[in-house]
Regions:
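Conserved, mostly hydrophobic/aromatic
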Residues: 48, 118, 167, 174, ...
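Active-site-proximal loop/short-helix segments
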Residues: 63, 72, 126-148, 177-203
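Active-site-proximal, glycine-rich beta->alpha crossover segments in alpha/beta enzymes
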Residues: 74-170
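Alpha-helix-loop-beta-strand connector modules within alpha/beta enzyme cores
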Residues: 82-85, 107-123, 195-221
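Active-site beta-loop-alpha junctions enriched in small/polar residues
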Residues: 130-132, 187-189, 225-231, 248-252
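Eukaryote-skewed repeat-based solenoidal scaffolds used as protein-protein interaction platforms
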Residues: 157-171, 175-176, 187-195
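Non-heme di-metal
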Residues: 162, 183, 211-212
């Protein structure tokens, strides 16, 4: 019997808090720092120095994917990063008519260029991407999405497949650019927003198959670091389980140390928020995430 999906409580600040002041100190400018790969790379290195992180993060907002599909973006200021502004679609069918996410044009290309620059300099690059529901939230009113999930699942399957194909090409291009960790978050896909029934179906019918696909395509060349909200949904639907990383017993590594250890050994992690990277955890309590095999589904009928 499938258990309850728990909601992971977000208790960390926004990414903008880590770059306030750094943009000015580096003599970088807005919005160029969000649009130019070289400036992105410079800011990412500066943030790493400021926060004493062991990795570098890109990009500095969560609007790259939606913008690449046509969303209107307000580039904000030094303290408030880019945000989508308004909707460009009124009907779900219009999503299918949008162009593809082109990894060689626009901001995706610049983000990947920044990733490549940093990887070539020996940095461990974490690329943060967002999932389908969050992307759709920048394109269309989510009420239409949730209604479609209930009333027109065939259409929604086409919509989700389109978004998933775009994400697949972006993630594969990221690995080719030297990215070793991909942070995957779909913060809108939660129990409070979607409700347990819709989220359960979305997790089993869309999230799990997509993550299986990405694990196969990426071949563990990069670790996919799941937002714990997504990890909790997988666990609550018995779509995944946790397995100890196998780090040396008796040590207390950071969560970030766990990521670096897991690269090439596990497809996924996600027990804590990415912003908890410096939290120390007993080695035996750092886990990788193992997706349920497709063959296991038949035994639950």
């Amino acid at each position: 019997m499938v258990g309850e999906i728990k909601d992971y409580p977000c208790s960390y600040g926004t990414k903008e808090e880590s770059i306030v002041g750094v943009v000015k100190a580096c003599n970088l400018t807005v919005p160029e720092v969000y649009k130019d790969g070289e400036q992105m790379a410079e800011l990412s290195r500066a943030v790493k120095r400021t926060t004493n992180d062991g990795v570098v993060y890109l990009p500095f907002d969560h609007a790259v994917e939606a913008e690449a599909l046509g969303a209107v973006v307000n580039y904000g200021s030094e303290t408030v990063g880019p945000r989508t502004s308004g909707y460009i679609c009124d009907k779900l069918e219009e999503i299918l008519d949008l162009g593809t996410l082109d990894t060689k044009k626009g901001r995706p290309a610049q983000v990947l260029n920044a990733c490549r620059i940093l990887a070539d300099q020996g940095e461990t690059v974490v690329l943060e991407i967002v999932g389908p529901i969050t992307i759709l939230n920048g394109l269309i009113d989510l009420r239409a999405v949730f209604k479609g999930m209930r009333k027109n699942p065939e259409l929604m399957e086409k919509v989700f497949r389109k978004i998933e194909d775009d994400l697949s090409s972006y993630m594969q291009a990221a690995v080719a650019a030297g990215v070793k960790i991909i942070s995957y978050g779909d913060a809108v896909a939660t129990v409070p927003i979607m409700g347990p029934r819709v989220l359960k179906n979305y997790t089993e019918m869309n999230v799990l198959p997509f993550l299986r696909r990405m694990e196969s395509e990426l071949e563990h060349k990069a670790l996919i670091l799941l937002c714990p909200k997504t990890a909790y949904a997988l666990e609550g639907t018995e779509s995944a389980s946790y397995k100890p990383l196998g780090m040396p017993q008796g040590t207390h590594p950071t969560y970030e140390d766990g990521w670096l250890f897991a690269i090439g050994k596990f497809g996924f992690m996600g027990q804590m928020c990415i912003k908890a990277g410096k939290r120390r955890v007993p080695a035996e309590k750092l886990y990788g995430i193992i997706l349920k095999d497709e063959g296991d589904e038949d035994h639950e009928q």
